[in-house]
Amino acid sequence: MTSQTTLRPATAGDIPAMEALIQRSGILLSKGFYSDQQAAAVTRHVFGVDSQLVDDHTYFVIERDGKVLACGGWSKRATLFGGDQHKSGPDPLLDPATQPARIRAFFVDPSAPRQGLGRMLMEHCEREATAAGFQAMELAATMPGVPLYLACGFESVEDFSLTLPGNIAVPLSRMRKRIS
């Protein structure tokens, strides 16, 4: 019997499984890109589910045999990165005619890397953002995500560093792609 992989909108009931996946992915898939200290800091202070995306129905999970193997989404809101623990204040809507949609919080379970799950999420998000009238997409990439985003047609427009508690600097890359 073959396993079926399905992509569906995330629900509030998925949040515990997604948070656990994000923790595993943030630590294990950062090896070779970030120091252990950087991976732990970014996973603790930045990575996580942004429940606004779940409420907006723009965050998705990929499941196989009932197990969540990947999550990620897009947003019509201004926040560029970070889970609920990183947010402060309202998250205004973007203007699709003049501002890029945001690609947000892509994570793959360390048990399922390089199986096309990230690309599947990206293609789905691009279709949805295009249907919503957006002309471009933008994201803040962690170093482990840069190869996927380059392969999906994104270009780096700015490298920057995020300083986290403990004065831990984590390099990121702002990336953009035209979609229509």
What name fits each language-model region?
Residues 119, 131, 143-159, 165-168:
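Conserved active-site alpha-helix within GNAT-family acetyltransferase domains
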Residues 23-49:
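Conserved GNAT-fold acetyl-CoA-binding loop/helix
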Residues 122, 129-142:
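Conserved GNAT acetyl-CoA-binding A-motif
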Residues 1-16, 180:
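Conserved N-terminal entry element of GNAT/NAT acetyltransferase domains
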Residues 18, 50:
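Hydrophobic pocket/interface hotspot
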Residues 10, 104, 140-141:
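Small/polar loops that bind or transfer phosphate-bearing groups
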Residues 56, 63, 70-113, 123, ...:
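Conserved acyl-donor/pantetheine-binding loop and adjacent beta-alpha core of acyl/acetyltransferases
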Residues 116:
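Glycine-rich phosphate-binding loop
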